[in-house]
Structures are given as C-alpha cells and as structure tokens.
Amino acid sequence: MQGIVIKNTGSWYVVRLDDGRLFQCKVKGNFRLKGIRSTNPVAVGDIVRIVPTEANAGQVGMITEILDRRNYIIRKASNLSKQSHIIAANVDQAALMVTLRHPETSTTFIDRFLAGAEAYRVPVIIIFNKVDLLDEEDRHLLELFFRLYEGIGYPCYGVSALNDGAGLCSVDTLRKVLQGKTTLFSGNSGVGKSTLLNALIPGLDVKTAEISDSHDTGMHTTTFSEMFDLPVQDGELPGHIIDTPGIKGFGTFDMEREEVGHYFREIFQTSKECRFGNCTHTHEPGCAVLAALEEHRIAQSRYTSYLSMLEDKDEDKYRGKI
C-alpha cells in the first residue's frame, strides 16, 4: 500500500493512501535514511509504503519504505548541531512568510532560508504579511525589500491576511500562485501563517495566537507539520500547503564553507569574475564580489548574511540593513 505523509505528530504519522483512506502509522524499527542523520526520518510530503498492523482492526499501519525524494528542505535540529531536521519533502516551492514589524523578520533569517532552499534546489516565493500595519517609512522599506529580492529572482507578494483589501495583492491572487503546486509554508513565529492559511482555505480554522507584548515575538500555534488541500475551482489543478511550526532560527546544515557563496545567487554569479577560484570574498585581491559591494551592486544586508553563514554565526546576532 502506498500513500503520502500528510501529518507528523511526533511518533505517529498520518498517511493518505492513493484511494483517500487515512492510516495512523509508526516507523518500522530503527528505520533510517542512508546518508542523513536526522531527528525525523519521515517528513510530511514523503511518499511511503505501509503495511496494515494486523493486531489492530482500525486503519493503523507501519511505514516500511520511503520512496526516493525529489527534494527536501533541512535545517539543524534544535540543540543537536550534528543532527538535522527535515522540514518537508517533495515540494514544488517554498513560501517564506516575513513581516517587517510585529514581529520583525531579520534579513539574515530570510537569507539563510533562501540559501538553504537554493542548496536543495527548492524555488522560493516571499510573502510579506501585515502590510496594512506599515507606516509611510515602513512602506518605503517594503519597496526596498521588493526591489532587492525580486532583483535576484525571488517573487514577492504583499498581503494582509486579516484585512484582505489592504494588501498589495489579494489573498485570492496569492491562492492562484499556490494552485497546482505543493508549497512549504515557513517563517518566524508570529508572522501570521495560520491566519493566512485560514484565509486561503475557508473553513480550515487553524488555531492562531497573539504576539507576545513583552518581546514582540510570536508564540507557536502549529506544533507539528501538516499538509492541507487548497480549494479547487473549475479547471484548476489541486494545490497543497505544508504548514510547519514557526521557526525562531534557521541554522543551515552540512554546508561547506567554500560552498556558501554558491547559494547566494548574485554572489555566485559575480564570483565568476574573481581573480582566484577559491576566493572567499572577504579580503582577496581582485575579488569581484567586494568590488560589486563597494559599487552597491550587491546589497550590504546580503553580504552580511553571507558572512554570518561563512562564520557559522547565529542569525539573531545579525540585523543587516538593506
């Protein structure tokens, strides 16, 4: 029997079979994937084979095999720097939700996520939520963000999940961007992922929570990853969203120091003009990246993010300005 993992609840996984039936499954024995030291060998989005558990009359089974993944997104497991946590598998794109205020998403968090997605060949769109809360100065900052990230190839959308008419694009317009694809939703806690999900999928009623008044940071409402189906209109292909717990930090995993620049699109492209093939873009003579930085062809915030990853620093220590 074959199906797709649509929910992870820790030790149990919900698997939807090709015929639509749902099975509560566990992983067989010490099941592990070759080459990956992971806290969770099975992820939402995985295509798996299962066998029903004979001892149970209900729809309970055991996962015996994970079929080859098209891709996956991975990050360091919290407090376990040598292990990884697979966020989702077999996705067509990732949607990174960010907010400029309430709470503020740091540019280094954004860039670390983008670099991680680049490493695993997952396209990313950036969704700026709560744009209705921005004052004139912040709206100018939003324009700079759009110019920066769209300029290097990441589509950007400005929405207001709670006040749809106040967004730069409507929730329905965004839904059409997501239709026909499996999209990973990710972002810091408190950016409004659950609220936007409720707007995209009427009747879903995912739990939401307020922002912490004392720290202006989000409080987790999503505990485990889960896949939701987008409503389908005439002629549309089905779309799916994988909702993930809010991430406070995004530590990259298994990225060699000399590879970091490969996952910053503009740095990688510019580095082809560097005098030395092993240039780190920090001090070398004839470095095209440093020249581009000096000429403002590469944003200071992106370079700061690059340095933080090069030095393997925590992104919370970096608050880059565009």
Task: Please report, for each region that a protein language model flagged, where it lies by residue.
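Helix-rich effector regions associated with P-loop NTPase G domains
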Residues: S11, R37-A55, L67-I87, P123-V124, ...
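Hydrophobic "anchor" residues on beta-strands that sit immediately upstream
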Residues: G61, A95, I125, L184, ...
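Conserved beta-strand/loop subsegment of P-loop NTPase cores
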Residues: N90-V98, R121-V131, I152-V159
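Conserved ATPase-coupling elements of RecA-like P-loop NTPase cores
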Residues: S106-T107, D135-L142, G251-M255
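Canonical P-loop GTPase G-domain recognition
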Residues: L133-V191
